[in-house]
């Protein structure tokens, strides 16, 4: 199925005009949505629990309230807290204060699609999911363009949910560069699969395996790091700019030939079957339930995974090498300023 890219000219209704907007959470996505919408002339308040996020939102000039207070004041409520805390936050502080005709939005379909959150039938449910981290959503908006976004409607109680979703996307700058309509199911399952099988899980496992093969064969860890990790950015940037074609036009004939003959030896049909199993665990809710249950138990699995990852040899080698490369990691510092 193909989808049509839409732009500012396609946003026909200023559905947020006259609406009080509450952004719930002031982290990576929260600060970007709130600031961009405010700069687009929208009436935005922040709902967040006391702490660093609360203080940061006030410092940035927002009227800042508890989540309960913000929900009571708002017509449109965008929930941008971390996925794992949204259910308890919604049930305790948002749901009791919703009114018929309100709209509730998300930047990821996780809690709605897997039914951890169930919104009353007389409330709209929409999505605006920028395809980039919050600091990039904010920076590109300030530069006069934006980050593309997906939008979706899960529940249209008022007949205006799609207009709200599209106008929200316009307000954060996404419609400047392109919007794609999707569904909660499609966005959620594809996003999780991309993260797990390719972008995060698949990529880090591939890099680590390559590093281990080289070092176990007696090659210097520092050189192995450069070959399998440091140069990754150069290749990904080429693919990002012009697809596989530009990357292959930019590398040597030797590298291109090796790409064709050895890539399929690494990513075999068995690997593809493993990817299908990952997708199945996403589709049937196993991953979602495991993740949420781990959070409710105090994150024992996630904590153990983090400790194990921090002790990888490639991480230790990389940390030392990057000390000699001050130009690495100096951009986009705001990516790490997550206000909890």
Swiss-Prot record:
| Keyword Metal-binding annotated | yes
Q: Which residues bind NADP(+)?
A: 26-29, 49, 53, 83-86, 134
Asked if the Swiss-Prot or TrEMBL record annotates the protein with the keyword Oxidoreductase, the reply is yes
EC supergroup of this enzyme = oxidoreductase
One biological process term from GO is: L-valine biosynthetic process
- Pathway annotation from the record: Amino-acid biosynthesis; L-isoleucine biosynthesis; L-isoleucine from 2-oxobutanoate: step 2/4; Amino-acid biosynthesis; L-valine biosynthesis; L-valine from pyruvate: step 2/4
Single GO molecular function: ketol-acid reductoisomerase activity
Q: Which HAMAP family match?
A: IlvC
Tell me which SUPFAM superfamilies the record gives: 6-phosphogluconate dehydrogenase C-terminal domain-like (SSF48179), NAD(P)-binding Rossmann-fold domains (SSF51735)
The record lists the organism as Streptococcus pneumoniae (strain CGSP14)
Any single GO CC term annotated in Swiss-Prot or TrEMBL for this entry: cytosol
Where is each KARI N-terminal Rossmann domain found?
3-182
* The protein's name in its UniProt record: Ketol-acid reductoisomerase (NADP(+))
Q: What EC number(s) does the entry state?
A: 1.1.1.86
Q: Provide the function of this protein.
A: Involved in the biosynthesis of branched-chain amino acids (BCAA). Catalyzes an alkyl-migration followed by a ketol-acid reduction of (S)-2-acetolactate (S2AL) to yield (R)-2,3-dihydroxy-isovalerate. In the isomerase reaction, S2AL is rearranged via a Mg-dependent methyl migration to produce 3-hydroxy-3-methyl-2-ketobutyrate (HMKB). In the reductase reaction, this 2-ketoacid undergoes a metal-dependent reduction by NADPH to yield (R)-2,3-dihydroxy-isovalerate.
Entry binding sites for Mg(2+) 1: 191, 195
| Domain KARI C-terminal knotted per the UniProt entry, residue ranges | 183-328
What keywords does the record list, in alphabetical order? Amino-acid biosynthesis, Branched-chain amino acid biosynthesis, Magnesium, Metal-binding, NADP, Oxidoreductase
- Cofactor descriptive note: Binds 2 magnesium ions per subunit.
Q: Name one Pfam family in it.
A: KARI_C
